[in-house]
Amino acid sequence: MNDYRFETLQLHVGQENPDPATDARAVPIYATTSYVFKNSAHAAARFGLSDAGNIYGRLTNSTQDVLEQRIAALEGGIAALALASGAAAISYTLEALGQNRGHFVAQKTIYGGSYNLLAHTLPNFGITATFVNIHDLAEVEAAIRENTRAIYIETLGNPNSDIPDIDALAALAHKHGLPLVVDNTFGTPYLIRPIEHGADIVVHSATKFLGGHGTTLGGVIVDSGKFDWEASGKYPAVAAPNPSYHGVAFVKAAGPAAFVTYIRAILLRDTGATISPFAAFLLLQGIETLSLRLERHAENTRKVVEFLAGHPQVEKVNHPSLPDHPDHALYQKYFPKGGASIFTFEIKGGQAEAHKFIDSLKIFSLLANVADVKSLVIHPATTTHSQLEEKELGNQGIRQNTIRLSIGTEHIDDILADLQNGFDAVRA
């Protein structure tokens, strides 16, 4: 199946044939908590991981399984684990890697929730992080310690769409025996596949572009299957016999899919951030049109960026497609199809002007989500990043006049007219 092109894979992987029980062509919603074993030996084999398949609804579900297969194929990974939210996917990944007082080197311009997790929540459990200018490889390397467990980046930083050099960071991580973890929520596998550039683990908030319609929470961890968990001795949770799973070493039981298998069998088992079958179904509906939506998002974004860049009431547009953006060359390298539909601009003035602009929009919805088919807007400094101190906001490139846009798929003339109405209201 993987020989097919992206547009075909997004429709068929995981259900190449109709449902064998009902001949249904659409993926069924399997609303069940449990699964009947054929006999006692079959049950024991499932629990011992020697026979892959459903055990209990907290761990696996047949609708969820199709979603996992499909996203793994689209990202070029060996396996995936779908979870209840993007926050769960990121948390489980970092907890699995960082246990026993681990440390991360992280891009400093990342989603506010991920920043708070690394800067404030995980340190309560002995896991720490150093935030770096991800474009300065010397600074990144200098931040690596004996207990560092991974380098963590986003393909497109939230909210300013800054772009790391994934190839270079993967080489640096591997030089030190570390995995590179990449959040590809804003990139999507249609625009960029981080595993092809050396990433070892990819995470998503599937709530965003993968689902695409603002209806469903979900998260995904994709395992490249390429990282050697045994080589450094730093990852006993994955490589060593696990006392809470009758001595199973996941690298032996699951082979190259050891990382996501460990998270499913241990962290998901014990803490239960399970995706519902209905949520998995809705995300699958979104993925079926991913390429079509992303093309329209990219086209509309290009025209909005041009409009804002030439507007007299705009102080600055933070979009990597612009030649004067510091990551323009990286944008051309990693995003030949375009993209970066979530970005910020700075309106002339301050917080009052930003709020008046936002409150005057009609088509753009003021809400915390992004990557919806509907156009969205928010003021990061007083909402999504409001937990950050002023210095932290500055480090993230956020000012009081910063406005974040998420460009939808409406007609471009209506989008531009709505933005102009906002500017007119500020000037009035």
Region annotations inferred by a language model:
Residues 1-61, 69-70, 403:
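N-terminal "arm"/small-domain region of PLP-dependent enzymes with the aminotransferase-like
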Residues 39-91, 113-120:
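Conserved N-terminal alpha-helix of the aminotransferase class I/II PLP-enzyme fold
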Residues 151, 219-221, 317, 343, ...:
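Well-ordered beta-strand positions enriched in small/hydrophobic/aromatic, beta-favoring residues
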Residues 271-274, 278-280, 285, 289, ...:
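Conserved small-domain helix->loop->beta segment predominantly found in fold-type I
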Residues 14, 18, 80-310:
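Conserved PLP-enzyme active-site core in the AAT-like
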Residues 78, 119, 128, 146, ...:
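PLP-dependent enzyme catalytic core of the Aspartate aminotransferase-like
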Residues 222, 344-346, 406-408:
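Short hydrophobic/aromatic beta-strand micro-patches
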Residues 156, 185-187, 322, 348, ...:
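Active-site beta-loop-alpha junctions enriched in small/polar residues
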